[in-house]
Swiss-Prot record:
Encoding gene per record: Col4a1
Keyword DNA-binding in record: no
Species the sequence originates in: Drosophila melanogaster (Fruit fly)
Mod. after translation: Prolines at the third position of the tripeptide repeating unit (G-X-Y) are hydroxylated in some or all of the chains.
Stretches the record annotates as Disordered: 89-643, 655-1187, 1200-1285, 1336-1530
Entry protein name: Collagen alpha-1(IV) chain
MF-aspect GO terms: extracellular matrix structural constituent; extracellular matrix structural constituent conferring tensile strength
């Protein structure tokens, strides 16, 4: 009975609905039963629903209340319609969501209802008053890594940065004095245990330990360290010329040589040549005696490459005295000595095991400041302030001031009026990528999920569109530790290059003195000379109880022991030794989630992964650097005699020729006159670093000028060819060219003998002017390391230093050695009650049986459609492509080689002595001086100031994570960069003419297996062609689809009689046969009679089941109406960064908001007016080290520097003055004096930040660490995946057994395997061609088979007749998915290329020309519609450009992306018949077609020829079981077999199939596992009942029918008598057991449904299974002779929409659910594809009657959420013991 107020409310609503002019009946939506009114259809003329024509419309408005027709109405009465008795129609489609009903009047107050469930989280309340500043919180956990911020504008000079990367190695400093001895360091860690010494010599009996005899000579000592580098020797005289080396390879043909120059006189030595490549070592030749000719001293050559490794040196001098020999054998025990004195305290004992937790320590020192906290919540909006008085009028407009500080937050202004729509602007140019949006609001923390099951590695899907980075959600609670997943397949990553070293951190503060180290391991035994061994120290106190160790790794299972004798009883026996570990119990109830363990130690690096797939072709690279200059070509042949000057001959003008081929690159022309200034071009890309120019004289420092404004565009300049310019200066040294070809024979040079004169001596010149100071020299190379100075005296000890601050925590120490065994701990507390053990182990192991392989298992069911696999490995290298188009013209080449040296000038007279020139370059190092006399000790110095920061030490071990450092200063926003120029679009190439048909090429090699193509469109059926000539034999085809069941064959001919054999003796009973293959599924049985009520018990939760296959995607549901705004969702998965969208249109200015977080970088602002000069700022912090400054002015003459190393080759000098006497060689100069060291130049300005370095190459794999200690026993792992089929084992040992008794007749075996192929039959005669069969119906599309190997080319067929276009075929059913292809073989590993120098980032290349049409791509997936970008701002109209010249054809474009499959176009006219194409490759097997109409039986053909023997095909899939054949002939009696070995004991498993099935539901997303001894048949989803056409059909949760293998919101269709079935066209519903996932606010759909559907498994049990119920909160015991499977709660029945529902038989295991849920099931609307928990769903459970008396009235009570399970009866599922 409804309450009074509800009835009144219903009456009011009904009355309101009937009064309305357009009222509707109530409509049930979903199952919520909400009343809907038709307010939305008010005053509309159109009908709300279409009206069926089979019904008449009665206008009831004109029939008054008294004019109603009588019950037996005739047709003549007004408003009367014939009575239509129609059958009840099917349930209609779900109606649209009705409008919201009118609000009813307020009802009377009802009775106080029961307390409701805990309400949902309320809306956030109003902001409170700002609270007082709280105490400083403890440092938070490390947050997740933030989203990378947008590139901000360049900032002002920031605070001092952290230390830069290690610079290049500096010059070796002068060796410092030897430092004082340091304080003793902290105690080191224990060393490794030394090896045991040899046995010592016997000691003497008495206590007089005299000195032993002299030992044998020790082992030869190791070679001493290399001595210091010797002084550089003086340069030796030039040696004699060596013998000629072996003849080199002949060079390539050089270019034709230039005409030879006229010779004028003796040639001078040429310029030094370019540094050559490192030569090969010369082969040894006998050295002939030569004489030395002194040549002119050449220029100093470049530093040569390192020489080859020298030969092994002579044996060194005898080594130092060897180390002491090993200790001798242990002597005999000595006599007892006198009692010694009290010994010193022994060393502390080894560290005991970890003790219990100590008392809390003292408060630590204050920590470093924590990181800046997250922005707090915005405070409450303050009240508006009072309006101030009006200010004075402002003055004239001033110049824009500098940016002011950030103003306070303004009030929210009133929204302005809506403006008129602006005119659509022209589409702007593509904008730059927009800035990344801010992070979204964080999601609510999700519910703590159950421990995940180990998932199988999914195949990688296609790369989806690049998603935008989602917001960072609040971190959810840590989930339970999942199981260790299998190792994934090797990734296809591309090997990155080795990364650069990281930036060093700040130097740490001085640490306090470390604690005393652990005790070192015992050292090697010391020498015993006169001392006596001390007495052993007393044993240390027992350590405190340590924590439990980690589980060790499980040992291997031992063999079964021999069964022991029955023991007798004894009263005084001592307790026996500890028994062996028992067998593992059943899995326990899942424990609570443990605390998060410490992070594991870093594992070894994995093996190198497979080579990654080739990346996409990158843009064309930049022009590479010029190659090295090749070796000089061979000398050309002498030229022919010279001819007259061709320039004097006037050439006759010939006819215009055809355009010639493009000429070679011309010689560089003279520089033209400078043109007028052109329009400023766009800013170029970052250019390459130029060659170092000639040093100019240092200029005066200019004052920095202000940045000028951009000038106006200049007038386009005219280009007038200028006069030839002067000869330029020599260019920079070119790179070494490639090896040139031998030149052609050159022209003969003219050498006029009358021009060869001795040069006349000139007059003496005037003294020259003082030369300009030369440019400062470049920094010299680092000097060679100086010699080690003499060891100074030890200075006096300085005063103690000031006590440093407390140091940071030291790095975490390495794991100490295992401590000594501690005192046994106290006995632990009693453990929890154990789980019932498993069945006992089998008996003693019998003699080994004879092994034989078992039969092949049946084929598995078709798997669900897998996810799209990873991109396969890169296919084999394709055929060479066609010749590419002509490339772009190359860049201008570098300057050519230096010209030939000029003629020597006439020798002048000796000039006067010039003025003193600038200081010369530092000479070579001087001869080292002799060692000085050792000085006296100096007086004690003052305490020194703190020393400089030392050089970085070697890389230390990885430390523990440090505390958070203080947050650095925020950088200043930098200036925005200028916009780069847009690239020039390429010119589209003209479409070429269609080429002629080429000749048929030779057969190419067989290609690799390609990926399966997408199904093409259904083609039009053609007429039957003529019969082709028989093709050549094809290659083996792919395995065929499983064929239909064949008809029984005819009886074969009788076999030959077998050989007679002796009668065998009666055998012993044989062992039980192996279990046969699984038979075909039986037909469904008739419904059984209702069983007796059973009892139930609740087993413990089994281990998590294996991950189920992914279900198919459901059908797309219809678009629902927009729901209300949902609660904030859970944190989404981070998507990949989306591509940046276009620049949006400017929005309407908003009201001033609250102070936001620091905004992203602004767009570049316009250039402001120059501001006034600011005040002098505070002294800034030290800046970063600047880049290398420009060369400073010439310094004062420094002191004599240390001897430098041999310098690099100098710049080529000016030509020397002519020698006074030709051909006279100068003497070797004396060694110059040591030069002065210049002063250090001024510090340069800070350089620009360089581009990021290239990622370094992958480092070498580290050495394998020492093996770790054995771990404790691990937790038993979850059930592993079914492993691959093992290889056939070796045949077992065959021992002839005794004769067995006759065995029981075995059951019918399953179908045997396919027999081996028979022998090759004889070749038959060729058969005649049969009659063409009838055309079959088109079949459904088959699965995409793997691409077959390319068949051999067939003979060309006869041309067929023109066919008429056939009717389009019927669309076939989609076939099952093809098998996943085998993984391709790894490609050959390429040779390692040389590491290239890092190139600068190249500019984007010009767009290529339109490439040739690519092959038709596979149909692409439908992409999501991208958001429409806002139109950009209209750009300025540019000047009209001149017509550009035709560009050179671009590089061929890359192959286009696969195109989207266009919709089929209209049918075209029949085309002309084309020529016969070459025979195509064999197609993939087609999908299985529909069964065609049975044709008439053809005439029997003649016997065909015997075909050639085909290759043995791969075994096909197992066929259907055939019909039983007719009984064969009785076979001959077989030979007597050998006596078999005794069989192995039978396993505890069943030797027969019981057929008793049991279903278990996990009520979670995890698939449950069958109990031990049960056989898993299938897994699925837990179906409770189906509501169809308002009738409910219930499933017994204990029967297999409640576990369906696939899930769908509507797994059924409805069929009527008119042979028509409908699917998803009615309002049918399904109900499923659900999980413990949180109840959603709105219906869920698509993949979100998965987390709410319970999983199940169907098992075959060895014996009958029942459920028993206690009707109390105590779990009932199973009856005698039964054992428990699981425990649970007594679930009886359920109801949902209307009167639908069902129940469970109490003896069925389905009445005992393992988890209690107030709403244990979820309702799914079949047609809509959504699922939800509705208020009408009710579950009924057995009540706990423990505290109530029978036959007394139940007491009404409301049970809250926390107490529900204590009022529900418990149950247990039990199975009868089969043992």
């Amino acid at each position: 009975m409804l309450p009074f107020w509800k009835r009144l409310l219903y009456a009011a609503v009904i009355a309101g609905a009937l009064v309305g002019a357009d009222a509707q009946f109530w409509k049930t939506a979903g199952t919520a039963g909400s009343i809907q009114d038709s307010v939305k259809h008010y005053n509309r003329n159109e009908p709300k629903f279409p009206i069926d024509d089979s019904y008449d419309i009665v206008d009831s408005a004109g029939v008054a209340r008294g004019d109603l027709p009588p019950k037996n109405c005739t047709a003549g009465y007004a408003g009367c319609v014939p009575k239509c008795i129609a059958e009840k129609g099917n349930r209609g489609l779900p109606g649209p969501l009705g409008p919201t009903g009118l609000k009813g009047e307020m009802g009377f107050p009802g009775m106080e209802g029961p307390s409701g469930d805990k309400g949902q989280k309320g809306d956030p309340g109003p902001y409170g008053q700002r609270g007082d500043k709280g105490e400083r919180g403890s440092p938070g956990l490390h947050g997740q890594a933030g989203v990378p911020g947008v590139q901000g504008p360049a900032g002002n000079p920031g605070a001092p940065g952290i230390n830069g990367k290690d610079g290049c190695d500096g010059q070796d400093g002068i060796p410092g004095l030897e430092g004082l001895s340091g304080m003793p360091g902290p105690r080191g860690y224990a060393g490794q245990l030394g090896s045991k010494g040899e046995k010592g010599e016997p000691a003497k009996e008495n206590g007089d330990y005299a000195k032993g005899e002299k030992g044998e000579p020790g082992w030869r000592g190791t070679a001493g360290l290399a001595g210091p580098q010797g002084f550089p020797g003086e340069k030796g005289e030039r040696g004699d010329s060596g013998p000629y080396g072996a003849k080199g390879p002949r060079g390539e043909h050089g270019l034709k040589g230039e005409k030879g120059a006229s010779c004028y006189g003796p040639m001078k030595p040429g310029a030094p040549g370019i540094k050559g490549e490192k030569g090969e070592p010369a082969s040894s030749f006998p050295v002939k005696p030569t004489h030395t000719v002194m040549g002119p001293r050449g220029d100093m050559g470049q530093k040569g490459e390192p020489g080859l490794v020298g030969r092994k040196g002579e044996p060194g001098p005898e080594g130092d005295t060897g180390l002491d020999g090993q200790k001798g054998e242990k002597g005999l025990p000595g006599g007892p000595g006198d009692r010694g004195r009290q010994g010193n305290f022994g060393p502390p004992g080894s560290t005991g095991q970890k003790g219990d937790r100590g008392e809390p320590g003292l408060n630590g020192l204050p920590g470093n400041p924590g990181q800046k906290g997250e922005p707090g919540r915005a405070g409450a909006t303050g009240k508006p302030g009072l309006l101030g008085p009006p200010g004075p009028p402002g003055g004239g407009r001033g110049t824009p001031g500098p940016p002011g500080p950030k103003g306070p937050r303004g009030y929210v202004g009133a929204p302005g009026p809506q403006g008129l729509n602006g005119v659509d602007g022209l589409p702007g140019p593509q904008g730059y990528n927009g800035q990344k949006g801010g992070a979204g609001l964080p999601g609510r923390p999700g519910n703590e999920g159950p421990p995940g099951k180990k998932g199988e590695k999914g195949t990688a899907g296609l790369n989806g569109p690049k998603g935008s980075i989602g917001p960072i959600g609040h971190p959810g609670p840590p989930g339970p530790e999942g199981q260790k997943g299998d190792a994934g397949l090797p990734g296809y990553g591309i090997q990155g290059s080795k990364g650069d070293a990281g930036i060093p951190g700040y130097p740490g503060l001085k640490g306090s003195k470390g604690e005393r180290g652990f005790k070192g391991n015992a050292g090697a035994p010391g020498d015993s000379k006169l001392g006596r061994p001390g007495t052993p120290g007393a044993a240390g106190a027992p350590g405190q109880k340590g924590d439990a160790g980690r589980p060790g790794t499980p040992g291997q299972k031992g063999d079964m022991g021999i069964k022991g004798d029955v023991g007798g009883k004894c009263s005084s026996c001592r307790a026996g030794p500890k028994g062996d570990k028992g067998t593992s119990g059943l899995p326990g109830i899942p424990g609570k989630d443990g605390a998060r363990g410490p992070p594991g130690e870093r594992g070894y690096p994995g093996e190198r992964g497979h080579d990654g797939i080739n990346g996409q072709t990158g843009p064309p690279g930049e022009k590479g650097e010029d190659g090295r200059t090749g070796l000089p070509g061979a000398t050309g042949e002498p030229g022919k005699p010279a001819l007259c000057d061709l320039s004097l001959i006037e050439p006759l003008k010939g006819d215009k020729g055809y355009p010639g081929a493009p000429g070679a690159k011309g010689v560089q022309g003279f520089k033209g006159a400078e043109g007028l200034p052109g329009i400023p071009g766009p800013k170029g890309e970052f250019g390459f670093k130029g060659e170092k120019g000639l040093s100019g004289a240092p200029g005066n420092d200019g004052t920095p000028g202000r940045a000028g404004r951009d000038g106006y565009p200049g007038i386009p300049g005219q280009s007038i060819k200028g006069e030839p310019g002067f000869h330029g200066r020599d260019g920079a040294k070119g790179d070494k060219g490639s090896f040139g070809r031998s030149g052609e024979k050159g022209e003969p040079g003219s050498c006029a003998l009358d021009e060869i004169k001795m040069p006349a001596k000139g007059n003496k010149g005037e003294p020259g002017q003082t030369g300009m100071p030369g440019p400062p020299g470049e920094d010299g190379s680092p000097g060679e390391r100086g010699y080690t100075g003499l060891k100074g005296n030890t200075g006096p000890q300085g005063p103690p230093g000031v006590e440093g601050p407390r140091g940071l925590n030291g790095p975490r120490g390495e794991k100490g050695n295992q401590g000594a065994v501690g005192v046994p701990g106290n006995p632990g507390k009693d453990g929890l009650r154990g789980i019932p053990g498993r069945n006992g182990q089998p008996g003693p192991r019998g003699e080994p049986g004879i092994s034989r392989p078992g039969p092949m298992g049946p084929p598995g069911l078709n798997g669900l459609q897998g996810e799209k696999g990873d991109r396969g490995p890169t296919g084999p290298i394709g055929f060479p492509g066609a010749d590419g188009s002509v490339g772009y013209p190359g860049d201008r080449g570098d300057a050519g080689l230096p010209g030939v040296s000029g003629r020597p000038g006439i020798v002048g007279e000796k000039g006067d002595v010039g003025p003193i020139g600038p200081a010369g370059v530092a000479g070579p190092p001087g001869v080292p001086g002799i060692d000085g006399v050792r000085g006296r000790d100096g007086a004690k110095g003052e305490p020194g100031s703190p020393g400089l920061v030392g050089m970085p030490g070697n890389k230390g071990d990885r430390g523990a994570p440090g505390n958070d450092g203080p947050k650095g200063f925020a950088g200043v926003t930098g200036a925005p960069g200028k916009r780069g120029p847009a690239g020039i679009p390429g010119v589209s190439g003209a479409k070429g003419d269609k080429g002629a048909t080429g000749l048929t090429g030779n057969d190419g090699p067989v290609g690799g297996r390609g990926p399966p193509g997408a199904p093409g469109l259904m083609g039009i059926k053609g007429d039957q062609g003529l019969a082709g000539a028989p093709g050549q034999q094809g290659l083996d085809g792919m395995p065929g689809e499983k064929g239909n069941q064949g008809f029984p064959g005819l009886d074969g001919p009788p076999g030959l009689p077998g050989d007679a054999s002796e009668k065998g003796q009666k055998g012993e009973p044989g062992p039980s046969g192996l279990r046969g293959d699984t038979g075909p599924a039986g037909t469904p049985g008739w419904p059984g009679e209702k069983g007796l009520p059973g009892l139930a018990v609740h087993g413990r939760a089994g281990p998590p089941g294996e991950k189920g296959d992914q279900g198919r995607s459901g059908i797309d549901g219809r678009d629902g109406i927009n729901g209300e705004k949902g609660e904030q969702g859970l944190q989404g998965v981070w998507g990949q960064p989306g591509e940046k969208g276009s620049v949006g249109a400017p929005g309407i200015p908003g009201a001033p908001g609250m102070d936001g977080l620091p905004g992203a970088a602004g767009a570049p602002g316009a250039v402001g007016y120059p501001g006034d000069r600011g005040d002098k700022g505070e002294p800034g912090l030290s800046g970063l080290p600047g880049l290398k400054g420009e060369t400073g002015p010439v310094g004062l003459q420094g002191f004599t520097g240390a001897p430098g190393p041999k310098g690099e080759r100098g710049i080529r000098g000016q030509p020397g003055l002519p020698a006074t006497v030709p051909d006279i060689r100068g003497d070797k100069g004396s060694q110059g004096e040591r030069g002065y060291t210049g002063e250090k130049g001024e510090q340069g300005e800070r350089g620009l930040t360089g581009p990021a370095g290239v990622a370094g190459a992958k480092g070498d794999r580290g050495l394998q660490g020492p093996p770790g200690a054995s771990g404790l026993n691990g937790i038993p792992g979850a059930k592993g995946d079914i492993g691959p089929r093992g290889e056939i084992g070796y045949p077992g040992v065959t021992i002839k057994g005794e004769k067995g008794l006759p065995g029981r007749p075995g059951r019918n075996g399953r179908q045997g395997l396919i027999g081996a192929p028979g022998l090759i039959g004889e070749r038959g005669l060729p058969g005649l061609a049969g009659e063409p069969g009838l055309v079959g119906l088109p079949g459904p599309i088959g699965p995409a088979g793997s691409k077959g190997e390319r068949g051999l080319a067939g003979s060309p067929g006869q041309p067929g007749q023109d066919g008429f276009p056939g009717a389009p075929g019927l669309k076939g059913d989609t076939g099952p998915q093809g098998f996943k292809g085998e993984r391709g073989l790894n490609g050959f590993e390429g040779q390692k290329g040389d590491k290239g120098d890092r190139g600068l980032q190249g500019p984007s290349g010009l767009p290529g020309l339109v490439g040739q049409k690519g092959d038709t791509g596979y149909p692409g997936l439908n992409g999501n519609d991208g958001p429409v970008g806002a139109p950009g701002e209209r750009g300025f109209t540019g000047p009209k450009g001149r017509d550009g010249r035709d560009g050179t054809p671009g590089l061929p474009g890359q192959k286009g992306e696969p195109g989207m499959l266009p919709p089929p176009g209209p049918k075209g006219e029949p085309g002309q018949p084309g020529r016969n194409g070459p025979k195509g490759e064999p197609g993939r097997p087609g999908e299985r077609g529909l069964i065609g109409i049975q044709g008439e039986r053809g005439e029997k053909g003649e016997r065909g020829l015997i075909g050639e023997t085909g290759n043995v095909g791969r075994p096909g899939p197992k066929g259907d079981r055939g019909e039983p054949g007719e009984r064969g002939y009785e076979g001959a009696i077989g030979l007597i077999g050998q006596k078999g070995e005794p069989g192995a004991p039978a396993p505890a498993a069943l030797d027969y199939l019981t057929g008793i099935l049991i279903t278990r539901h996990s009520q979670s997303e995890t698939v449950p596992a069958c109990s031990a001894g049960h056989t898993e048949l299938w897994t699925g989803y837990s179906l409770l009942y189906v509501d169809g056409n308002d009738y409910a059909h219930n499933q017994d949760l204990g029967s297999p029918g409640s576990c369906v293998p696939r899930f769908s919101t509507l797994p059924v269709l409805s069929c009527g008598q008119n042979n028509v079935c409908n699917y998803a066209s009615r309002n049918d519903k399904t109900f499923w057991l659900t999980t413990n996932a949180a109840i959603p606010m709105m219906p869920v759909e698509n993949i979100e449904i998965r987390q709410y559907i319970s999983r199940c498994v169907v098992c075959e049990a060895p014996a009958n299974v029942i459920a028993v119920h206690s009707q109390t909160i105590e779990v009932p015991d199973c009856p005698n002779g039964w054992e428990g499977l699981w425990i649970g709660y007594s679930f009886l029945m359920h109801t949902a929409v209307g009167n639908g529902g069902g129940g469970q038989a109490l003896q069925s295991p389905g009445s005992c659910l393992e988890d209690f849920r107030a709403t244990p099931f979820i309702e799914c609307n079949g047609a809509k594809g959504t699922c939800h928990f509705y208020e009408t769903m009710t579950s009924f459970w057995m009540y706990n009657l423990e505290s109530s008396q029978p036959f007394e009235r139940p007491q009404q009570q409301t049970i809250k959420a926390g107490e529900r399970q204590s009022h529900v009866s418990r149950c247990q599922v039990c199975m009868k013991n089969s043992s």
